[in-house]
Regions:
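Mid/C-terminal beta-alpha module of Rossmann-like enzyme folds, strongest
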Residues: 207-275, 296, 303-331
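N-terminal Rossmann NAD(P)H-binding glycine-rich loop of SDR-like oxidoreductase domains
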Residues: 7-27
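Conserved Rossmann-fold NAD(P)-dependent oxidoreductase catalytic core, especially the SDR/UDP-sugar
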Residues: 90-139, 155
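NAD(P)H-binding glycine-rich loop region in Rossmannoid oxidoreductase-like domains
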Residues: 37-100
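A conserved pocket-lining segment of Rossmann-fold NAD(P)-dependent short-chain dehydrogenase/reductase
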Residues: 178-199, 210, 219
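Glycine/proline-rich active-site loop of Rossmann-fold NAD(P)-dependent oxidoreductases
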Residues: 138, 164-176, 211-224
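Glycine-rich "substrate-gating" loop/helix at the edge of Rossmann-like oxidoreductase active sites
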Residues: 160-170, 190-202, 212, 228
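Conserved beta-loop-beta element that borders a ligand/cofactor-binding pocket
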Residues: 109, 142-166
Length: 331
C-alpha cells in the first residue's frame, strides 16, 4: 500500500501530538517524531522516534528531511518558559519546513482572542489577546503568515479545551477529575450558566487527518475552527461524567473549582499565575464557529459526549479494572 505522505511531528508525546501521530499512522502516513531522550517508545507503534530537541534547529532540520508535512504540537511543559521557548521552537520548525517546502500544521487555541471577539468566533475574527500567553499565540500565527508570504503553506485547526484518554495536561484531567480513581468530586472551573467549548482529542486528530488528506485543495494559509462539544450552560460535561461514574456504581458531586486558593498561591508560582490570567475564558461564553470546516469536509468528526467521556475516564485510569459497567453489563 502506498504511503499517504511523510510527516514529522513535534510534540508527539503530548496530548494532541500523540493523537495526530496515531491517527496518521492508521491513515498510512510515514510518521516521524522528535523526542528528547532515546528509545522512549515501542517501535511497533508505527512511529519512527528520533532523539532530538525542538530547540535545536539542526536536529529539527535533520528529522524533517524528506517530509511533506510538519505538525508543530510542541509546548514547554505546563505554563512555564513560554516567553523564552515557544517562538524559538516555532522558528526552527519554519526553517526546516522552508528547506523541505513542507506544509506546517499548528493546533490553534482561543487564547488569541479578547472579549471583543466573543461569544461566537469565526476564522477571520480580529485577534486582540488580553494575556501574555495569548500574545505569544498571536505571534506564532503571525510567524506562520510570514512563512506563507515567503512561499510556504500552513494549516491552523483551532478547537476548544482538549480532553482525551491519553492527555494529562488539560483542564479535564487536572481540574475536573483526578486520574487513577473513580471520580467522587467533579471540580468545575466555570461560572454557573456560562457555556464552554470542549474538544475530544481523537476528533481533533481525525479533523487534521481529513484536512491533510485533501491538503492540495487547501489555500496557502488555511484556518479552520472546530465546534467540538459545546456545553451551553456549563453543566453537560459534568453530567456526562456523572452518568459514566454511575454506570460503575459510583456517585460524583459537582463542586466549584477553588479559584480563590489558586489566586492566593499565584504570587509564588508561575504556573498558577498563568492559570489566573486565563480565568476569563471560564467566566464568559467562548464558542468557535465551524461553518467553514463543515463546508469543506462535509461534516466535522464528532464522537458523542458520553462515549468520549467514557473513553477518557478509562484512559485516565478513573474506571476500576474489572468493574461491571452496569448499563452495558460488561467489564
Amino acid at each position: 500500500m502506498n504511503s499517504s505522505g511523510k510527516v514529522l511531528i513535534l510534540g508527539a508525546s503530548g496530548g494532541i501530538g500523540g493523537e495526530v501521530a496515531r491517527r496518521l499512522v492508521a491513515d498510512n502516513w510515514q510518521v516521524r517524531a522528535l523526542k528528547r531522550g532515546a528509545r522512549m517508545r515501542d517501535p511497533e507503534d508505527g512511529i519512527q522516534w528520533i532523539a532530538g530537541d525542538a530547540l535545536d534547529g539542526g536536529q529539527v532540520a535533520a528529522a524533517a528531511a524528506g517530509c511533506d508535512v510538519i505538525v508543530h504540537a510542541v509546548n514547554p511543559p505546563g505554563y512555564r518558559h513560554w516567553r523564552q521557548q515557544v517562538l524559538p521552537m516555532l522558528r526552527n520548525t519554519l526553517q526546516a519546513a522552508e528547506r523541505q517546502r513542507a506544509l506546517v500544521v499548528l493546533p490553534g487555541t482561543v487564547y488569541n482572542y479578547g472579549q471583543d471577539a466573543f461569544p461566537l468566533i469565526a476564522e477571520e475574527a480580529a485577534q486582540q489577546p488580553v494575556t501574555r500567553k495569548g500574545a505569544i499565540r498571536v505571534a506564532m500565527e503571525l510567524a506562520l503568515e510570514d512563512y506563507v508570504q515567503r512561499g510556504g503553506r500552513a494549516l491552523i485547526v483551532r478547537a476548544g479545551d482538549f480532553f482525551g484518554p491519553r492527555a494529562g495536561n488539560n483542564w479535564f484531567s487536572q481540574g475536573l477529575v483526578k486520574p487513577g480513581q473513580l471520580p467522587r468530586i467533579i471540580s468545575y472551573p466555570g461560572a454557573i450558566g456560562v457555556g464552554h467549548q470542549w474538544a475530544w482529542l481523537p476528533d481533533v486528530a481525525a479533523t487534521i487527518a481529513a484536512l491533510l488528506a485533501r491538503r492540495r485543495e487547501l489555500e496557502p494559509f488555511a484556518r479552520f475552527h472546530m465546534q467540538g462539544h459545546w456545553d451551553p450552560d456549563g453543566s453537560e460535561m459534568s453530567q456526562a461524567i456523572q452518568r459514566v461514574v454511575a454506570r460503575y456504581g459510583g456517585r460524583a458531586v459537582v463542586k466549584s473549582f477553588p479559584w480563590w486558593l489558586v489566586k492566593l498561591a499565584a504570587p509564588f508560582n508561575a504556573t498558577l499565575r498563568e492559570m489566573v490570567e486565563m480565568h476569563y475564558l471560564w467566566r464568559l461564553p467562548v464558542r468557535l464557529r465551524n461553518d467553514k470546516l463543515v463546508d469543506f469536509l462535509g461534516a466535522e468528526p464528532h464522537t458523542p459526549l458520553d462515549s468520549a467521556v467514557y473513553q477518557t475516564l478509562q484512559g485516565l485510569g478513573c474506571l476500576p479494572a474489572g468493574a461491571i459497567n452496569q448499563e452495558a453489563g460488561e467489564a
